[in-house]
Amino acid sequence: MSDWKKRNEDWRDEDELEEEEECECPWVDSKGKVRETAYCQYLLEKHPMMCLKQKLFDQNGEVDEDALLYEVHSDLRDFVLDNLAKKEKQVLDALRIETYTPEWKPQLDRIHLQNGTYFLDERGFVPEKELCLNRLPVEYQPDAPAPTKWLEFLDGLLIPEDILTLQEYLGYLLIPSTKAQKMLIMTGKGGEGKSRIGLLLKKLFGEASHSESILRIETNRFASANLEYKLVMVDDDLNMVALPE
């Protein structure tokens, strides 16, 4: 057999192998065209999501759409030869329609954590995860040692009664409820360490927290939209100017 003929058969084998690999994708038709609905179903089987008011959520809370777009890009780039970016955005739009959820009632009986879900009833902690609006970037560790440095810091900043008040308030923030209708204001001299509590809130709540100015929320009608689906808003530099009536 000549080298040319052997190379030709090798190329043919490679082409046939590529065709077989392409056929393994249930979201690609016989002509190599991506079927958007089938691809959305394929994506949701490995990555369950829901869509609330044009925002996508999964088991970790609000979806990073840049990361999701890259995942779609990685799947489609070998099949879509032209207008790939347009097709990717069309897929995301189709995904929002496919996962449309008209309403999501606040889950007041559980806290979503990195290593599972903590139920406030007799079930306690379970390692399973589910779709949620927020998942805190911390783990539940029942045998964790006492946070001695944090307790020492609070002891030097607040009186014992105020430490209990702070602890109670932080507990309210763990569930998506405004039933208490309370906000926490800490006043004092500069340099005492009050801002560290704000930093702790950002670390504890992650994407479920939002830094914003109360004055801006009062004067900018678009600012409050950033608070939707958040558990806490932190204003670590409160402006003492009177709010407009």
Regions found by a protein language model. Name each.
Residues H47-E62, D66-L68, H112, T117-L231:
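P-loop NTPase catalytic core of nucleic-acid-dependent motor ATPases
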Residues S30-R35, K202-E207, A242-E245:
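A short, contiguous, amphipathic alpha-helix enriched in charged residues
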Residues S2, L17, N239:
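Short, flexible active-site loop motifs that bind/organize anionic cofactors or intermediates
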